[in-house]
Regions:
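Structural preference for solvent-exposed beta-strand-turn elements
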Residues: 1-147
Length: 147
């Protein structure tokens, strides 16, 4: 799983090149409705948030799972059968690999949630929305490298 994050991060770094003309910062909000703010994604009982900056500096902030939260998640993970289980810890390794190779500042936060599958899905969807926004070309900075 970490290798997938590394490969995807390398692909992003190569595709973005010098980042000329992109927004660079991604909070996943819709420009037609700027009041939506950051990339919040609900998934049943979970709520996840992601903010990303393709700054050239690698850093992952992974928050929201305190020891009490992990005590709820680990038993639920153990109930999954091996064919459908995706260990929650692997998600963090994916995002660490991505942040390192894409050279981005990536903030992922679980605001609340209990079910491991829902948590992982909400985090990945929030990440996708924020990355999509950050990689879009902004006509106001066309041809320039964002600062």
């Amino acid at each position: 799983v970490e290798d997938c994050g590394i490969a995807l991060g390398q692909a992003f770094a190569q595709a973005l090149g010098d980042k000329r003309g992109i927004r660079r910062y991604g909070a996943g909000f819709d420009p037609r409705n700027p009041f939506t703010g950051e990339s919040y994604v609900p998934m049943d009982e979970c709520l996840a948030r992601c903010v990303i900056d393709f700054s050239g500096r690698s850093y992952l902030v992974w928050r929201g799972l305190n020891p009490l939260g992990m005590k709820k998640i680990l038993p639920a993970e153990k109930k999954q059968d091996a064919s459908s289980a995706f260990r929650f810890g692997l998600a963090r390794e994916f995002f660490q690999g991505f942040a390192n190779e894409a050279r981005c500042n990536l903030h992922l936060e679980l605001l609340y949630g209990d079910e491991p599958h829902h948590i992982v899905e909400a985090l990945f969807k929030a990440f996708a929305k924020a990355a999509d926004f950050a990689c879009q070309h902004d006509p106001r900075i066309a041809g320039r490298i964002p600062s």
